């Protein structure tokens, strides 16, 4: 009798891939974000079955909750459109959701004007 070990396949976990910053009240990515987009695209090219999730936020110190939610949705739409239109990423590989200002990923208020890009498990 021969014993054959089967390799253990570890399931990939979701991880933060990137953060894309925005100016106050803007849905247009802040200046100098091209390298961030290029890194996201490079990851997606190297991992052809990979998918990402875009979580949009707005800072809590300004605007009403509903206004901030709509702004966060516009931010994720902006990032999604750039990835699709400029870089040719398939829409089916991108999930997007606006979270608004109900959750704040960073302690520094200004940093919460952001879309966080998460690589999803394959």
Predicted regions and their residues:
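Periplasmic OmpA-like peptidoglycan-binding domain that tethers envelope proteins to the cell wall
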Residues: 28-34, 57-122
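Periplasmic peptidoglycan-binding/tethering modules of Gram-negative envelope proteins
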Residues: 1-51, 92, 110, 120-122
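Conserved phosphate/oxyanion-binding catalytic-loop motifs
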Residues: 54
